[in-house]
Amino acid sequence: MGYFIRVLGVYNDVIPLDELEAALERDELNATLSADQEDDPWSVIDVLSAKGSRLVQIEKNFVFPGCLAQAELDEFRLLIREHQPLSAVQWLDGYFDRIKVVYAFQVFDVAMIDDNYEVVSSLKRAIWGKSGGLLQNDLEGFSNDEGYHILWQFPDDITGDKYCAVLDNGAWVKFRMDLGDPFQRMAFWAGEVPQMAVRL
């Protein structure tokens, strides 16, 4: 079934299909994009690998009262209250009011094979570059509008480095932390820069 990543955009400009195809070409990636309608603007895109496997489906939904995207934002408002740091929860709660469009990427298992995920990443960068706003990954959390991770929703067994940020007097302090280090985790949860993290 795969999992979801999302771009929560503050600009709802039309992103033509050929712009996304051009982004893949710039990154020297081979994939086929199939939209739900021949002319822009599209609502759903299926992305197929060079071998014809479906890597990801991208669905675009504008935010307005009673719509699916608004329901997602309302659900996120409730969900983030269970996570840390509190300063990021409060910041996100206010930022959600600015979101105008949600791009939901349903990522299928085959995207994790070989170099397929590079296609997903390229399309995400291209869309985020036009729409601005936030990034959200299931089982990871949220990144701010600069792309730094700000809310912890990782599983307990997560390891590896991550570029993160915490708020200090309203400004983001950026750093690289070890997600597997329990002491760095506790500092991040408290909204502090971990002592062993590398400031950027």
Task: Set out the residue ranges of the language-model regions.
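Non-membrane alpha-helical secondary structure
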Residues: 12, 65-68, 72, 84, ...
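Short acidic, S/G/P-rich loop/turn micro-motifs used as interaction or catalytic elements
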Residues: 12-14, 108-113
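Short, intrinsically disordered low-complexity segments
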Residues: 18, 27-107
